[in-house]
């Protein structure tokens, strides 16, 4: 059986909305539900209602946990009022471009947590929700500031939470889960089952909490120039994986963000420990280059 989270907004002032919500466990006819007010930042001049519903969905899933602790999107239907939200989360488009179909950037940004942690959820438009009797009813009051809330995972190594970008999750699916190595094939994940994206989230949750995660430094004098967007990044290496990986994190105004996930063999610009060969130490980059050449011969 599928569970349904439904939200409906009504304007009740300048960038202020009344939200009525319900949670139907196994599509019960007597759901739990409630209402609250969402105040959207005054800088928002368009799509305030859609952003208010996104903030409401985030609150219900990430703060109130109406669906249960540690649950992802599989088996959940999210009913809301705006076509732009649904378009921003179309699975086929997400799997081929990393973006949905919507042209509204702020809605796509606000939907980041649904495109990552809750990838498996089904998002629909329900402009005319049914009248219902609630099993229980809760009221509260929240606000949406300029920074959209993000789904985060705790990282033991750095002692902070890390937001997971959709690019990082999708690169984990492509490079680590699906073992895709050809650059031209990384962006087309249309044949990958939805479940693998949620498995990617679980993988990130596991390795970021692992005591086997190690931070690596960029090798001094490295000829490899890291991409500009990762110039101030930190590199977290996890070797205990079928495909050893490096999670690239950076800090923005809201905190730490996982920007991408690399295979360890892509990160030769890092200062890897030397290998012992016979009676001498061989720099890791030279050892790996020799091994790759030997494999090709």
Q: Which sequence ranges carry the predicted segments?
A:
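RNase H-like nuclease fold core
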Residues: 1-47
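Acidic helix/loop or adjacent segment enriched in Glu/Asp that either coordinates divalent metal
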Residues: 38-70
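RNase H catalytic domain
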Residues: 57, 64-136, 141
């Amino acid at each position: 059986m599928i569970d349904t989270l439904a939200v409906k907004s009504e304007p009740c002032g300048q960038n202020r909305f009344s939200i009525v919500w319900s949670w139907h466990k196994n599509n019960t006819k007597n759901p739990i539900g409630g209402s609250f007010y969402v105040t959207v930042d005054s800088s928002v001049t368009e799509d305030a209602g859609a952003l208010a519903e996104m903030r409401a969905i985030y609150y219900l899933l990430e703060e109130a946990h109406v669906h249960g602790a540690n649950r992802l999107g599989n088996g959940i239907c999210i009913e809301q009022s705006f076509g732009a939200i649904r378009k921003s989360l179309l699975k086929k488009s997400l799997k081929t471009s990393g973006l949905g179909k919507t042209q509204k950037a702020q809605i796509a940004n606000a939907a980041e947590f649904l495109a990552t942690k809750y990838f498996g959820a089904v998002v629909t438009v329900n402009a005319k929700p049914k009248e219902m009797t609630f099993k229980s009813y809760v009221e509260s009051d929240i606000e949406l500031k300029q920074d959209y809330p993000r789904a985060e995972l705790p990282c033991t190594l750095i002692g902070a939470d890390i937001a997971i970008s959709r690019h990082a999750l999708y690169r984990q699916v492509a490079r680590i889960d699906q073992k895709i190595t050809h650059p031209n094939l990384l962006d087309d994940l249309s044949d990958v089952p939805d479940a693998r994206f949620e498995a990617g989230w679980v993988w990130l949750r596991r390795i970021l909490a692992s005591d086997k995660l190690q931070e690596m430094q960029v090798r001094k004098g490295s000829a490899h120039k890291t991409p500009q967007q990762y110039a101030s990044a930190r590199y977290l290496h996890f070797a205990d994986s079928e495909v050893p990986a490096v999670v690239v994190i950076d800090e923005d105004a809201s905190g730490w963000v996982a920007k991408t996930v690399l295979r360890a063999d892509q990160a030769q610009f890092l200062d890897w420990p030397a290998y012992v060969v016979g009676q001498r130490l061989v720099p890791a980059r030279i050892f790996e280059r020799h091994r790759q050449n030997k494999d090709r011969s």
